[in-house]
């Protein structure tokens, strides 16, 4: 999956101008208003189906500023530095970039996020795991222990996981059991053509197939 250097707000504006998954909006509208009642989520589907935009739309529901401000922070480790794209409520980790030292690097990243959330007023946050289908087997074996650590009523902070993946069959049952699964289908060529037609009629800049892929 490609993730373009585009702001969260631009992703959401594009999605709201032409929603290629109105059936998913019906489903996500039923999610709780309070993040403390939100379960972990698995958003899965083929590449180019719009999983990231759906995930951002869900996260936006719990943002205090509608994801208008995105920032970056760096996690410094013995194995190298890792840049995180963050908002007021969520933290993005591209699992495919963790490499062969993913187990140790993930540990450092996770507790960096915990430290940030711990000093915030509401002490709550969402970790968005992108390209989860590329997770190393050693990390996958212990991933559930991180998920359950701060996602129960007695925890001093609240962390919700949103997993974006192209497959789901490899994910351990424990993770699936504690998550709500949202299946995203790849948009048809007809939907793509409609998007391009609407966009080109309302803009002086001609949109292409690549532009369609960029914002889903």
Q: What are these model-predicted stretches?
A:
Residues 1-132, 140-142, 152-163, 173-175, ...:
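P-loop/Walker A NTP-binding region and its immediately flanking N-terminal helices
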Residues 144-146:
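Short, conserved "post-DEAD/DEAH" coupling segment immediately C-terminal to helicase motif II
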Residues 213-215:
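C-terminal helical "lid" of AAA+/P-loop NTPase domains
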Residues 131-135, 168:
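Conserved Walker B
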Residues 168-169, 189:
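Alpha-helix N-cap/helix-start and coil->helix boundary motif
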